[in-house]
Amino acid sequence: MSHLSKVQVAIRDIDVLGEALKALGLRRVGQVDENYEFADTFNQCDVIAVNAVNRVMAFRFVDGEAELHSNLEPGDFEKTRDELLQKYAVLLLKKTVEQEGKFQVQEQETLPDGTVRIKVGRWV
């Protein structure tokens, strides 16, 4: 049975989103084929990515935040969404630290439960 999920996610930086998708092994595409299920919904999105079995995660930006549309199965959807949001947060932090120039990432560690710990230091 086909399933389409839509949730609001706190993603604002399209470039960092693209990096996070790539890091998770998803590839960006311009659009999905017209014959593809839910193509109308996906093709209205600003960023479209597919996984190895052609399941889609698509992002439509509305008022500065992203709506995530996906046809992943519910369990896969939640797992992939959580991994994506974590990767996005890590990459956004690193980008922000680099842009600010006052801080530097000193250490990054992934804990056994999957939590990412990042140590940022300030040079004075």
Locations of regions flagged by a protein language model:
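Interaction-mediating elements
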Residues: M1-V124
